[in-house]
């Protein structure tokens, strides 16, 4: 077990603990006790110079930490107001994120609503917690993030399909504390109740994206504008015509429609050369560069690939600044460990899985594959690099 990959091992054991906790029930007290005992084992091993015991107890400690963190997250999910599923009344809540809009004859806008209370037909009110998807078929009524809404309807349960090969969204719904769906097909069933001042960062990001889109709108047609905004910030796939999405898919470049490490690398590279051109030192340049990357991540919605790429980029820049030996696999491990501690449900998110596996595949297999292709002697170097990169990214992704 190489020490330079310490964060990679940390992430692996944390993930193992989270995976274990998602299938087996245990109490937080029992998990905390095991966590304490394994920590004592690490400290005892250090005191008595037992390196093997330190590694074993350290691995157990990380597994226990992952399991406890997952149990804490599931306990929060169990405390949500799941008993209201199937209830009918007026649901009061706040728009938590930018709506997903589908245009056309049967178009609708889907809002994620952070519930606060329910008002029944007899006038009784109850405070509730959790989120719901609210479907508004009046697409022209767009409510910004942070707006309080009152929606009349019935809270219908989520449909979870267990078909082989279909993405299992159960853990993602639990992560969002999602209870169900409310459909509003009649007029005046959704009423705005003013601004709340909550979700300010998300509201700011939404406003900035809209302003940027408006500035581009005078130079681009309505078809290309959504493509540009998706290339810049990801998401909004529903606004791109299906034939264009199909063209990206059949040509094998649909992945550029999602934000990835290349976006972060380009941003850091641009700021580095800008600082160099202005005569600024690396230490002076790195602070605004990190801040700008965080702003960009916020504007992109803090989805798992953006968080991973941003964390890896920031850690790499800090490593350069401190003039430490840099190991890309270790940086990936640090980013993954941080994300899993923040939200253990990320482990079950298909976006997170594909992003991490593709990155790990490139870091592990790119150089060996490139070297193997170069030994053939008949393939130009650029083609060797392209083939090796593409193949390496697919190796760990294929099982998923």
Roles of regions detected by a PLM:
Residues 59-255:
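Membrane-interface helix/helix-cap signal primarily in integral membrane proteins
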Residues 4, 8, 30-32, 52-56, ...:
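Catalytic cores of large soluble enzymes that bind and process phosphate-bearing ligands
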């Amino acid at each position: 077990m190489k020490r330079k990959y310490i964060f990679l091992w940390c992430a692996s054991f944390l993930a193992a603990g989270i995976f274990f906790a998602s299938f087996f029930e245990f109490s937080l007290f029992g998990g905390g006790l095991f966590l304490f005992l394994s920590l004592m084992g690490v400290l005892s091993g250090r005191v008595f110079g037992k390196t093997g015991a330190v590694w074993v107890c350290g691995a157990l400690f990380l597994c226990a930490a992952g399991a406890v963190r997952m149990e804490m997250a599931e306990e929060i999910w169990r405390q949500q107001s799941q008993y209201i599923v199937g209830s009918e009344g007026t649901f009061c809540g706040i728009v938590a994120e930018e709506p997903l809009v589908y245009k056309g004859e049967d178009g609708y806008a889907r809002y994620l609503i952070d519930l606060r209370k329910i008002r029944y037909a007899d006038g009784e009110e109850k405070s509730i917690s959790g989120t719901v998807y609210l479907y508004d078929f009046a697409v022209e009524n767009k409510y910004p993030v942070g707006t309080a809404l009152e929606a009349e309807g019935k809270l219908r349960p989520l449909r979870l399909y267990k078909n082989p090969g279909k993405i299992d969204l159960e853990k993602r719904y639990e992560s969002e504390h999602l209870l169900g769906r409310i459909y509003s097909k009649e007029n005046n069933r959704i009423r705005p109740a003013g601004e709340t001042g909550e979700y300010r960062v998300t509201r700011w990001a939404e406003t900035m994206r809209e302003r940027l889109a408006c500035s581009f709108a005078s130079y681009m047609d309505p078809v290309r504008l959504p493509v540009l905004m998706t290339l810049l910030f990801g998401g909004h796939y529903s606004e791109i015509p299906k034939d264009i999405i199909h063209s990206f898919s059949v040509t094998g470049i649909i992945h550029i429609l999602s934000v990835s490490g290349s976006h972060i690398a380009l941003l850091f590279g641009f700021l580095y050369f800008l600082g160099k051109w202005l005569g600024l030192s690396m230490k002076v340049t790195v602070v605004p560069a990190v801040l700008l990357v965080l702003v960009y991540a916020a504007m992109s919605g803090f989805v798992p690939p953006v968080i991973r790429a941003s964390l890896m980029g920031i850690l790499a820049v800090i490593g350069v600044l401190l003039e430490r030996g840099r190991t890309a696999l270790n940086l990936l491990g640090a980013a993954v460990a941080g994300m899993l501690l923040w939200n253990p449900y990320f482990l079950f998110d298909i976006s997170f899985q594909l992003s991490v596996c593709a990155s790990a595949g490139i870091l592990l297999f790119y150089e060996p594959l490139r070297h193997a292709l170069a030994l053939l002697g008949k393939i130009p170097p650029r083609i060797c690099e392209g083939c090796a990169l593409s193949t390496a990214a697919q190796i760990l992704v294929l099982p998923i």
